[in-house]
Amino acid sequence: MGLQKTLALSAVAAGIMLSLSGAQAAPLLSSSEPMTINASDLAAKEKALTDFPLMEAVKSSIQTLDNSAVEQIEPGRAANPANVRRVESILKEADWDYLFPMRAPEYTYSNFLKAIGKFPAVCGTYTDGRDSDAICRKTLATMFAHFAQETGGHESWRDIPEWRQALVYLREVGWTEGQKGGYNGECNPDVWQGQTWPCGKDKDGDFLSYFGRGAKQLSYNYNYGPFSDAMYGDVRPLLDKPELVADTWMNLASAVFFFVYPQPPKPSMLHVIDGTWQPNDRDKANGLVSGFGVTIQIINGGVECGGADENAQSLNRIAYYKEFANYLKVPVPADEVLGCKR
């Protein structure tokens, strides 16, 4: 089952259970008679529960390009997808080299364009009056600010300023390919994570290690599996070969994937940036309003947000965002909420 289906599955099942439990004439089932839900009932309920504009926007935003087409993307190629050409018009390879001078060699400009191309909604064209180029610039500034915090060198003594020290780490510090015992406690086939995303094994029959790899430092089988499903339509490829998240264009696609996919109950970062997400009354009561600060909530709110003061990590993200925004000509309004303190 693809991730688009997974987005609504729990809501669908819950809705069916509620509908069935509300039927006045339905007899109670004994514990020895498990309830059976037909696939057609699930499909009908899914359609009913997802037939509204926001869900349609989510489904549209997570559409992906076939990998065979992604592999053809190269800088300057006339046949590149429209969203890739937009990025190329805003961010040249020379800009990439300037902004990320300390990057690991695997984080190439070509790989970044492929990662963008995989998700056509990123830097895509809006036909409802929104400024597509402006949204793309803000998307890149936001994404790069989080790159700098997640994989940055954070070495203040260098001549290169910290905001330009992103993408230093390809693999989690202290881990190498083939190393055993990394982030695979949930591989146990007796637990639901191990059943849903069955871990690959090495030649010795030991579970593979799912330590942090790529620009998002993707970790654990329960993150590799969904990412693999989005990339291949199958959970197995990256569960069997997690090293691909470091050694191929997946190293940057993993971060774009996280940018595009909502983290329920949080919206996607893309929908925060492009204005699709608008805070409701409860959001506003909790201090959640449109702006860069909400993207910090999405990416690491449990650790960095909610205190009386901004913590060190969120302050870094804010500082990096301002620098990237300035470079990419993204206006930062004085009243934009950039942080996530209480």
Regions found by a protein language model. Name each.
Residues D133, G205, K241-P242, N286:
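A general structural-boundary detector
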Residues T6, K203-G205, A246:
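Hydrophobic alpha-helical context, especially transmembrane and signal-peptide helices
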Residues Y107-P120, S209, R213-K284:
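Alpha-helical segment that forms one wall of the substrate-binding/catalytic cleft
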Residues E172-G225, D229-Y232, A255:
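Eukaryotic endomembrane system proteins
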Residues G2-A8, L18-G200, K266-R342:
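Cell-wall glycan-active module
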Residues S10, S209-G212, G293:
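A short, structural micro-pattern
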